[in-house]
Amino acid sequence: MPDSSFDGKAFVLTLPSQPGVYRMLNAAGDVIYVGKAIDLRKRVSSYFQKSNLSPRIQLMVSQITGIETTVTRSEAEALLLENNLIKSLAPRYNILFRDDKSYPYLLLTNHAFPRLAFYRGALDNRHQYFGPFPNAGVVKSSIQLLQKVFRLRTCENSVFNNRTRPCLLHQIKRCSAPCVNLITPEAYREDVNSAALFLQGKQDEVLKTIEQKMFEASDRQAYEQAVLFRDQMQALRMIQEKQFVDSSRALDADVIACTTGTDKHTVAVNLVMIRSGRHLGDKTFFPQNTHEDSISTVLEAFVSQHYLNRSVPPLIILGKKIRVTLLQKLLSEQAGHKVTLTINPIGERRKWLDMATENAQLALRQKQIQQASQEDRLQALQEVLNLPGLARIECFDISHTMGEATMASCVVYDHYAMRNGEYRRYNITGITPGDDYAAMRDVLQRRYAKIAMEEGKLPDLILIDGGKGQIGVASEVMIELGLNDIPLVGVAKGEARKPGLEQLILPWQEETLHLPNDHPALHLIQQIRDEAHRFAIQGHRAKRAKTRKTSSLEQIAGIGSKRRQNLLTRFGGLKGVKNASIEELQQTEGVSRALAEKIYRELR
């Protein structure tokens, strides 16, 4: 438990000279820093003996009221634990990289006619995976490309198994329609193999195979088929010309470059992914809490945190020197294969690093321009509302369809950016359908009851997507919770309901406020309000679709989750079940004649 009379020098004497992890706590009991050490006593004592600590570290030490330690068997184990704790606790004085969702893959399923699909999650060795890719857009564009060249199916198995005629994708020459046997299993398998070779970087091999097929088709006077093969070759050659490829060998590598802004506080880390010699794309990260840290320190933190519980390529190329030996050992153990970290490469790999550095510099310039714009907008809003020091804004919206599947959203804007990780959705039940006031009351009570008990951050401003009625309800809730000192602003759409005509409802004055269409404060309000609306309607649509898809079947006596799934799988969805005859329903596993008749009757 943190102690305001904590004596750091005395505490150090109780520590062992062994590897481990230490956690520094403040008066509130929050972990403000996590570190690792080969020698716990020596490392922790350095914070209380050095006189040349940076101002930032001096401030951190002044806030320490307790330290917790964990002894580990090795420095590598300490490094692993340190990064697990940094990811889970996000201490304010550690360099933090946003923990994105797992990287997406391109999937070829284990099926007689394999399906080409976007995939994110745990890997199953029954299927073929290609990647990882830096973002979803790269995977989706790759799927479109492979559809165009190899015409592989992308439909779900439930749809594939129940088609009776080719779909639109076949008509536009994006699928060979294996669902209705317009291609033989052998020919489809050849297309799948060619697609797999292409994704493995063996484009020349694929081109030779297609060229041979083209000549064979021409010799048989199957000119229409020969033209198809010719078009495939042309498409593949165009792709080759656009791709950045390592001509020496088809290796897998990640290239990581880091750059700082002119203020030395803003840092960008660019990750370029090379798989099978192909440049799959890049992704830029902007770490938090990097004040006074060197580029080498930032890079080491990135490598440590980024590859935790992720796939690791055999080669990682870096532009600055870091402690390679420990990281290589840890990453190799985690990956199950040798991982090499290369510093300052030459030749072709130097070009890759230069490209990553240029990407990082460009992304940093763009972010600084964007942040300057956000600073101007926030400053304008502070002046309009007379709220100096305004930093954190929370916005609420309610979404439903005629009272069905009501969903509320709360989005967070803090220090010039939307904070996606702090967004929350609230499932609204137990109210009169369509009662927006009751829905707003419910979400605000649930959101701020915990914060009133000091279990979260208080916003500097609350935006409500609505007019005087919603603001009135919001004011009542905040008074009940003792939080009525937090300013509330309602964002009403106005009579024409057009962007730019919004009226701001301010509880502390009678007249509504109307800002000019080009006012930067209005632009910030619109940005936050639109994000709350998007997040709410996205959740509402998902809830509504789930309800509509399952409720009709689940309300029938005798239909549990297993029988419902059997029916939906067999008929490709609820619509197929509704259109099925009693005899067809009876053929479903677990469905008797009597139950089939009941389903037929209930769904009509």
Swiss-Prot record:
The segment(s) forming the GIY-YIG domain are: 17-95
* Domain UVR: residue ranges: 204-239
Q: Which SMART domains match?
A: GIYc, HhH1
Checking Pfam families in the record gives: GIY-YIG, HHH_5, UVR, UvrC_RNaseH, UvrC_RNaseH_dom
Extract one GO cellular component term from the record: excinuclease repair complex
Superkingdom of source:
Bacteria
Ordered alphabetically, the record's keywords are: Cytoplasm, DNA damage, DNA excision, DNA repair, Excision nuclease, SOS response
Location in the cell reads: Cytoplasm
Which SUPFAM superfamilies does the record match to this protein? C-terminal UvrC-binding domain of UvrB, GIY-YIG endonuclease, RuvA domain 2-like
* UniProt-listed GO biological process terms: nucleotide-excision repair; SOS response
Query: Which InterPro entries does the entry mention?
Result: GIY-YIG_endonuc (IPR000305), GIY-YIG_endonuc_sf (IPR035901), GIY-YIG_UvrC_Cho (IPR047296), Hlx-hairpin-Hlx_DNA-bd_motif (IPR003583), RuvA_2-like (IPR010994), UVR_dom (IPR001943), UVR_dom_sf (IPR036876), UvrABC_protein_C (IPR050066)
Q: Does the keyword DNA damage apply?
A: yes
One MF term in GO for this entry?
A: excinuclease ABC activity
- Predominantly, its location class is cytoplasm
What PANTHER family does this protein map onto?
UVRABC SYSTEM PROTEIN C, UVRC/OXIDOREDUCTASE
- Describe its assembly: Interacts with UvrB in an incision complex.
Q: Which family does it belong to?
A: Belongs to the UvrC family.
Q: Which HAMAP family match?
A: UvrC
Role description = The UvrABC repair system catalyzes the recognition and processing of DNA lesions. UvrC both incises the 5' and 3' sides of the lesion. The N-terminal half is responsible for the 3' incision and the C-terminal half is responsible for the 5' incision.
Q: What is this protein called?
A: UvrABC system protein C
Q: What species does this protein belong to?
A: Nitrosomonas eutropha (strain DSM 101675 / C91 / Nm57)
Gene transcribed to yield this protein: uvrC
